[in-house]
């Protein structure tokens, strides 16, 4: 049983990237599915699908690589807000990751958004992770 499903997801993606795996399997929750949606919209993964039923639902994420060297599109992932120390930011304090080259994933009242979309909509929320 994993307490922090977001950290588990980020770790699985990081390890699969380092091993140059094409597909990574993560447990499916509402939050991991929303984060996968953001990764897909921002072009960090090719696609994802939900398989299984009931308590055994899994997300299959197709990772994206570039060039003949198969360099990962995702350079790094960093968990920010965690169960032991929640991190919140209002719309004025939303972080910029690497000066705009990366994204911050924010959980807002209107769902999980990137920092740019949250800033555009004037929303703050919990800063889940950074991806670049």
From Swiss-Prot:
It comes from the Eukaryota. GO terms for biological process: translation. Gene3D superfamilies: 3.30.1370.30, 3.30.1490.10. One of its GO terms (molecular function) is structural constituent of ribosome. Keywords: Chloroplast, Plastid, Ribonucleoprotein, Ribosomal protein, RNA-binding, rRNA-binding. It is found in: Plastid, Chloroplast. Its main location: plastid. Part of the 30S ribosomal subunit. Belongs to the universal ribosomal protein uS8 family. PANTHER family: 40S RIBOSOMAL PROTEIN S15A. One of the primary rRNA binding proteins, it binds directly to 16S rRNA central domain where it helps coordinate assembly of the platform of the 30S subunit. This is Small ribosomal subunit protein uS8c. It comes from Rhodomonas salina. The lineage of its organism: Eukaryota, Cryptophyceae, Pyrenomonadales, Pyrenomonadaceae, Rhodomonas.
